[in-house]
A protein has these predicted regions:
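Conserved class I S-adenosyl-L-methionine
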Residues: 19-32
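Conserved SAM/SAH cofactor-binding pocket of Class I
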Residues: 47-129, 134-140
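Mobile active-site "lid"/loop adjacent to the S-adenosyl-L-methionine
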Residues: 131-160, 164-170
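Conserved SAM-binding loop and adjacent beta-strand
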Residues: 29-50
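N-terminal auxiliary segments of SAM/dcSAM-dependent transferases
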Residues: 1-16, 30
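Glycine-centered loop/turn motifs
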Residues: 15-17, 53, 122, 172
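Short, surface-exposed connector motifs at secondary-structure boundaries
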Residues: 75-78, 167-172
Length: 172
């Protein structure tokens, strides 16, 4: 199954769908069995202020919703999403390609706990994250790994996110 936009094909794997983001024709590939963005990601993209020429990093980008939205809502120079789950990162890359944002948005597969080794120190002006809300062993854990990773501190903690952000943010 695939959609078509400006001569580009959206490659959709079984179970995936193409959702209209209601912003300048942007669409996002999602798989409800893995993870779909919520209103919190949209609110975050409305809240973040990125100035012209600034570089932004989204830690734990999932399907890439935040850097994709920010690329249209702000005047930032470049947006990068870091995602540990290869399937989610690949889905995000396909959304970036489908929307023609390859020059503005990169999706990198990697571990948040190693972000300062993946990227140059003090390289980013803004860092966003929509972190897991629940501590690892608290609350009902979703049996789907992708959803559990997004909602619980399974692969990283808030401390990991803050530590790596301090290393990657420019001093201002």
């Amino acid at each position: 199954m695939s959609g078509q936009k400006k001569g580009k094909e959206a490659v959709l794997f079984p179970g995936e769908r193409l959702d209209d983001l209601q912003l300048n024709g942007l669409e996002l590939i999602q798989d409800p069995k893995k993870f779909c963005f919520g209103v919190d990601a949209v609110f975050l993209s409305d809240f973040v202020k990125i100035k012209a020429g600034e570089r932004a990093l989204d830690l734990g980008t999932g399907n890439g919703i935040i850097p994709i939205l920010l690329s249209e809502k702000t005047q930032g120079r470049h947006f990068t999403g870091l995602e540990i789950q290869p399937e989610m990162a690949e889905m995000a890359r396909r959304s970036v390609d489908y929307n023609g944002l390859e020059d503005k948005v990169d999706i990198v597969t990697g571990d948040i706990k190693e972000a300062a080794e993946i990227f140059k120190p003090a390289f980013f002006d803004v860092i966003t994250t929509n972190p897991p809300y629940m501590i690892a062993d608290h609350g009902l854990r979703n049996p789907a790994d992708a959803k559990a990773i997004a909602r619980h501190e399974v692969l990283c903690s808030l401390d990991d996110i803050l530590r790596e952000s301090m290393r990657l943010l420019q001093d201002k």
